[in-house]
């Protein structure tokens, strides 16, 4: 299987997943050089055979993958709060259409965010696009144990900020 994280930041989440699940291939996607460099430095020390990093804009995702992805993680994505920026959200209909061509069989997206407006928008967007919400919480850390966290997630939870989460799929 191949799992990707779009907007992986410094890579903490995807690196921890690759270590914990050696039989799954992980691909981290990040658009900013300075950020992905941090992840590259961390991964070089670990010599993981199941983790790959790509510096690219997510708008080009269809040019890189074709019916081979099993799961997409969207962790603490930019909420693009202004109405005119809605199309830039990684859960906008425009992005969901892009994802259609990269999924192998079943479409599967897991999202975590501290931003309730982005969360609500994303849940509605996925439902309108035909996804089923399999699991959902507005307080992930009181709901599940043994969570692999992101750097942002650690920062927010240490301040008492609740993490919104959903797991959605579409056949």
Predicted regions, residues:
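Class I SAM-dependent methyltransferase "Motif I" SAM/SAH-binding loop
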Residues: 7-9
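Glycine-rich SAM-binding Motif I of class I
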Residues: 11-15
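Short alpha-helix immediately C-terminal to the canonical SAM-binding loop
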Residues: 36-38, 119
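S-adenosyl-L-methionine
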Residues: 40-66
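A short glycine-rich, Lys/Arg-flanked "PGG" loop and its adjoining helix->strand segment in the class I
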Residues: 91-108
């Amino acid at each position: 299987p191949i799992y990707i994280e779009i907007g992986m930041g410094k890579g903490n989440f995807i690196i921890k997943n690759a270590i914990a699940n050696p039989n799954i291939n992980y691909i981290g996607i990040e658009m900013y050089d300075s950020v992905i460099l941090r992840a590259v430095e961390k991964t070089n020390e670990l010599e993981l055979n199941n983790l790959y990093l790509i510096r690219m804009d997510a708008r080009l995702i269809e040019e890189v993958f074709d019916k081979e992805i099993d799961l997409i993680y969207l962790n603490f994505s930019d909420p693009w709060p202004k109405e005119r920026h809605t199309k830039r959200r990684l859960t906008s209909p425009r992005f969901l259409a892009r994802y259609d061509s990269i999924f192998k069989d079943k479409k599967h997206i897991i999202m975590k965010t501290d931003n309730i407006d982005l969360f609500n928008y994303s849940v509605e967007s996925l439902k309108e696009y035909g996804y089923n919400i399999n699991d959902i919480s507005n307080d992930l850390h009181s709901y599940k144990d043994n969570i692999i966290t992101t750097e942002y997630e650690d920062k927010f939870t240490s301040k008492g900020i609740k993490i919104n989460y959903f797991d959605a799929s579409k056949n």
